């Protein structure tokens, strides 16, 4: 029976490349000179922006988002937190990376597939939703229904099997 998986993943190599490009651009750009603006990464692949002012932090976030978009990383996978004051009159902002399909989102996807009326079954399997059906056309209709729902997270469709 044909099936596919709905997942929400981020290519960490592309994130790493975009992060390095953004860091390099911030170090070389004239308007960032002397502003003590820097980007750091932690073990969870989150990005920490440190800057001398709110405007520089927002500009650094824009540079990072631009580089991620050019590398093909969905910007919906970013979760920028609020700007918070740091020592020495600086500000910092944590930008979290959304990875994996949360249970609430998986339930919404299953509900959307069921309410579409297509003859397929959707089941939650860990951090993925497996959709199975008798015909390939039904699965493609399910993919279109999920995309049309406009979920606020980046979704990929993998393991399309006959």
Curated annotation (Swiss-Prot):
Any Pfam family hit: DUF520
SUPFAM superfamilies the record matches: YajQ-like (SSF89963)
UniProt keyword annotation of Lipid metabolism present: no
Record key words, sorted: Nucleotide-binding
Record GO terms (molecular function): nucleotide binding
InterPro entries documented for this protein: DUF520, UPF0234-like_C, UPF0234_N, YajQ-like_sf
GO cellular component: cytosol
Recorded family membership: Belongs to the YajQ family.
Listed NCBIfam families: PRK05412.1 (NF003819)
PANTHER family: UPF0234 PROTEIN YAJQ
Primary role: Nucleotide-binding protein.
Stated name of the protein: Nucleotide-binding protein Adeh_0094
Organism for this UniProt entry: Anaeromyxobacter dehalogenans (strain 2CP-C)
